[in-house]
Amino acid sequence: MEGSVNQSKWQAYSHLMRINKPIGTLLLLWPTLWALWLAGKGVPSLSILVVFVVGVFLMRAAGCVVNDYADRAVDGHVKRTAARPMPSGRVSEKEAKVLFVVLVLVSFGLVLTLNAMTIWLSLAALALAWAYPFMKRVTHLPQFVLGAAFGWGIPMAYAAVSESLPLSCWLLLLANICWTVAYDTLYAMVDRDDDLKIGIKSTAILFGRYDKLIVGLLQFATLLLMLWVGYLTQMSGAFYWSLLLAGALFIHQQKQIATRERDACFKAFMDNNYVGLVLFIGIALSYWQG
């Protein structure tokens, strides 16, 4: 009996950390890998790669915990989130706080194996991860904070590998912010009706009937900024082919959301994993060919 209770509790913790839903981890991982390869002009050292990959998993988990803690009073009123561990009572507020602290401490322990510049930058990463969930109550632009949070691994990667933050680093971060706002707007379009009822703010609500157009413009800006990064870092043809393929994926997403149907918007959001993968392959092949 005790074993089944413990198993149920650990399952609730894993759901709180979204271990069963890896899409967020992947969307955080791809730009981090882009930066590691660009900063290292090829494959980075194994030790740094391991720190960042594990760190991505831990900080995404921590972000999910603090997000559910912030939304604990409203998730029960939204069909998609009503069964989450906190609104369903499977995880208490105290347990969520402890889990968040543990995840952050382990993450920081990993960062301490890196240089001082990376350690200082990690403090901003923690602040962004904590701030994002609460932005949904004060601004219609929380997706921009999420973009910065999901992209902060980029300057950290440059700092860890090269101890420098060149223009390409900041352009890559800006590209990731544009991409994140685009795909998270698609995600917010799924919950728009529910969010309006409970007072949650999002770019999907702010953009209104111009949502598809603005998402398209953000996707186009992502490609232009990545093109600039490719020019500055002297990428080979493989990278530019990956940009074309990413553009084709964005066009497909626009077709998917044409009617703004919830399931289609969610599918378009999920498909952004392939955008991140394609761009990473383009970067990796550029250095492999070189």
UniProtKB/Swiss-Prot annotation:
Gene Ontology CC annotation, any one: plasma membrane
Transmembrane helix among keywords: yes
UniProt keyword list: Cell inner membrane, Cell membrane, Magnesium, Membrane, Transferase, Transmembrane, Transmembrane helix, Ubiquinone biosynthesis
Compartments where located: Cell inner membrane
GO terms classed as biological process: ubiquinone biosynthetic process
EC assignment: 2.5.1.39
Chemical reaction(s) catalysed: all-trans-octaprenyl diphosphate + 4-hydroxybenzoate = 4-hydroxy-3-(all-trans-octaprenyl)benzoate + diphosphate
Role played: Catalyzes the prenylation of para-hydroxybenzoate (PHB) with an all-trans polyprenyl group. Mediates the second step in the final reaction sequence of ubiquinone-8 (UQ-8) biosynthesis, which is the condensation of the polyisoprenoid side chain with PHB, generating the first membrane-bound Q intermediate 3-octaprenyl-4-hydroxybenzoate.
NCBIfam families registered for this protein in UniProt: ubiA_proteo
The name this protein goes by in its record: 4-hydroxybenzoate octaprenyltransferase
